[in-house]
From Swiss-Prot:
The keyword Ribonucleoprotein applies. It comes from Chloroherpeton thalassium (strain ATCC 35110 / GB-78). Part of the 50S ribosomal subunit. Contacts protein L29, and trigger factor when it is bound to the ribosome. One of its GO terms (molecular function) is rRNA binding. The gene is rplW. This is Large ribosomal subunit protein uL23. One of its GO terms (biological process) is translation. InterPro entries: Nucleotide-bd_a/b_plait_sf, Ribosomal_uL23-like, Ribosomal_uL23/eL15/eS24_sf. The keyword rRNA-binding applies. It comes from the Bacteria. GO terms for cellular component: ribonucleoprotein complex; ribosome. One of the early assembly proteins it binds 23S rRNA. One of the proteins that surrounds the polypeptide exit tunnel on the outside of the ribosome. Forms the main docking site for trigger factor binding to the ribosome.
Length: 105
């Protein structure tokens, strides 16, 4: 599948997982499976992937009060992938490069 990865998720929790366990979190195409996600990460960042876990996050219901009354809607469901890299591999999202050695810092 083309375009399995949509963008990396860079929240506080995801950053903590990256620093401690070399796990990276991505928003992915809802139709992508684990093998496609693994191949996309390996090709894009040139790293070895140890495992891939996926979660389907439910879309939230939204309400807005307007002059015409209550407008209700729902955000779409989306899929998140947590990718664990093999020992020693890292991804630099800001430079879009990967290194197999030690992390800079």
């Amino acid at each position: 599948m083309r375009n399995a990865l949509i963008y990396p998720i860079l929240t506080e929790k995801a950053t903590r997982m990256t620093e401690v366990q070399t796990q990276y979190t991505f928003k992915v195409n809802p139709r992508a499976n684990k093998l496609e996600i693994r191949k996309a990460v390996e090709e894009k960042f040139n790293v070895d992937v140890d495992s891939v876990r996926t979660v389907i996050c439910r879309g939230k219901r939204k309400r807005q009060f307007t002059r015409k009354g209550l407008i209700e809607g729902k955000k779409s469901n989306w899929k998140k992938a947590i990718v664990t890299l093999k020992d020693g591999a890292t991804i630099d999202f800001y430079g879009a490069t990967a290194s197999a050695g030690q992390a800079n810092g």
